[in-house]
Amino acid sequence: MAKLEQYFDYVKINLASPERIRKWGERTLPNGQIVGEVTKPETINYRTLKPEMDGLFCERIFGPVKDWECHCGKYKRVRYKGIICERCGVEVAESKVRRHRMGHIELAAPVTHVWYLKSLPSYISILLDIPLKDVEQIVYFNSYIVTRPGNCPNLRYKQLLSEDEWIEIEDQLYQEDSNLYGVEVGIGAEAIQKLLKDVDLEVEAESLREDVLSAKGSKRDKAIKRLRVIDNFIATRSDPAWMILTVLPVIPPDLRPMVQLDGGRFATSDLNDLYRRVLNRNNRLIRLQEILAPEIIIRNEKRMLQESVDALIDNGRRGRTVVGANNRPLKSLSDIIEGKQGRFRQNLLGKRVDYSGRSVIVVGPTLQLNQCGLPREMALELFQPFVIHKLIHQGLVNNIKAAKKMIQKNDSVIWSVLEEVIQGHPVLLNRAPTLHRLGIQAFEPILVEGRAIKLHPLVCPAFNADFDGDQMAVHIPLSLEAQAEARLLMLAPYNFLSPATGEPIIMPSQDMVLGCYYLTTHNPSQQKSQAYYFSNLEDALLAYECKKIALHSYVWVRFEGEVEDENLKIRTSILKEKYTLDIFTERIIKTDEEKKVIAQYILTTPGRILLNKTLFDSLTLSN
């Protein structure tokens, strides 16, 4: 098989037509035979342990089990590459083709796709404008639906009929003197398919647009909902009838393997059991139709086929959940795709990548907003190629091997080189689940001791992170373009507003709010060293650092700035030399005879001084 490299911009998931599903699995052999249809529920032969032909593991459909060897053994070795065996019809190829070659099952009766029937909103229900409950009654053979009312006055288009009502109309229809004609009713997925084929999307969309303009309330909302679905069908050029399956795709056998265990027993994927149920019921329905079995038996078999396809696509979505050994529910196609352990989140979005690391986050209150603390050990591993290049460039070593040896020895030179390397090289921090674009942001790394990543507390709301054991991933942008994009677009200070609401997302929370409250709170209990006087704010902080006063001790501090005048005046004292002392509850002002302020003391705590100084320093620094 030729290896092709195909570049693409995006992947679009769309409804598949029956022709496309056949095209996925069908191949034409040199003798003109078309292979691809799985017709037998058998998997492997119990004596030879080789896959059964036309079964779920058929080598003719899916490719050989052994590299460069056909089923019958006539052709072995790579020199026969591409040859199709005349005896068994198997193409000589690598066994890994069994990971992507598909097959298909031709269904004896159409069945509805359970995603489009039972998911909310139900697209089949919306498109036909029939309540979901009624659609289910039709699909599972409990009620008939009128597809052509003919000239019967008691019938209308899309009217539901019970078994007894239809028998009564049928008796009138086939009477010798009956004037009724053109009456058609249906049941099951075939009836839904006929109704969907009758829907003219363009005409329906035009009619709904008029309804949206004229209608009000719930009727208008319903029209908008239908119009949105119809417009999407028109835009994607999908036929609504494709929501009814006539051909069922069979996924490649290596994605649903059967593995032999030590004791000779086999472990198999649940999908094989679900496919086997579909094939058994499909083959039984074909036989019943061939022998012209009674309608009631055929209808029951069609219902069972519908239920088996439902279980294959989404087990448990409707009806009783199909269980295997030990009453364990079988994993359907939907179970493999969806959820945290599903194919998308586990294997595609969550795959391991180079130049990345992961560790627990801890708070880094001393960091700048655009910085993160990166453990030395992790940083050395992530930036190792850059460090090696720098060591060779500076002439400290001659080759890569010597550089790696120096790194392993933990030479002291390494850390200074690492400091140079990370200077101006942003890193990306990501916290799963990345539900919005702020779940991954760029920071400038600072080397820290220990094994935990240090994160600025202000960016926690954007990541929805807290410090109770959360982990974050680190990624290194390698190219200059990636580094420039990280620096210009993804740096934390540039992601100030929430993309959802437009409101600031960088806001103090949790520990920061509690810390600010603790620093500024009134503490009525007796603290040590109350009512000291200090000549400036720095002296008060120095006394606190020397443990002469407590964080919440009330002290008088000389302050030259403006103070809000909300204090209650207690008394005024006249001092010698004509000075006046105005005493307030939290302030003392000394003035001369011209009322000019000579000195002002305020009552405060070291905690409040500390908060005020921190805010003042950060504001003056930013300016």
Swiss-Prot record:
Q: Which reaction does it catalyse?
A: RNA(n) + a ribonucleoside 5'-triphosphate = RNA(n+1) + diphosphate
Presence of the UniProt keyword Transferase in the record: yes
- Name listed for the protein in its UniProt record: DNA-directed RNA polymerase subunit beta'
Q: Which SUPFAM superfamilies would you find in this protein's record?
A: beta and beta-prime subunits of DNA dependent RNA-polymerase
Question: Acetylation among the record's keywords?
Answer: no
What is the native source organism of this protein? Rhodomonas salina (Cryptomonas salina)
The cross-references to Gene3D superfamilies, in alphabetical order and at most eight, read:
1.10.40.90, 2.40.40.20, RNA polymerase II, clamp domain, RNA polymerase Rpb1, domain 3
Listed cofactors: Mg(2+); Zn(2+)
Pfam families with a match to the protein in the record: RNA_pol_Rpb1_1, RNA_pol_Rpb1_2, RNA_pol_Rpb1_3
Q: Which UniProt keywords apply?
A: Chloroplast, DNA-directed RNA polymerase, Magnesium, Metal-binding, Nucleotidyltransferase, Plastid, Transcription, Transferase, Zinc
**Class of the enzyme per the UniProt entry, highest EC level:** transferase
UniProt EC number: 2.7.7.6
Q: Which GO terms describe its cellular component?
A: chloroplast; DNA-directed RNA polymerase complex; mitochondrion
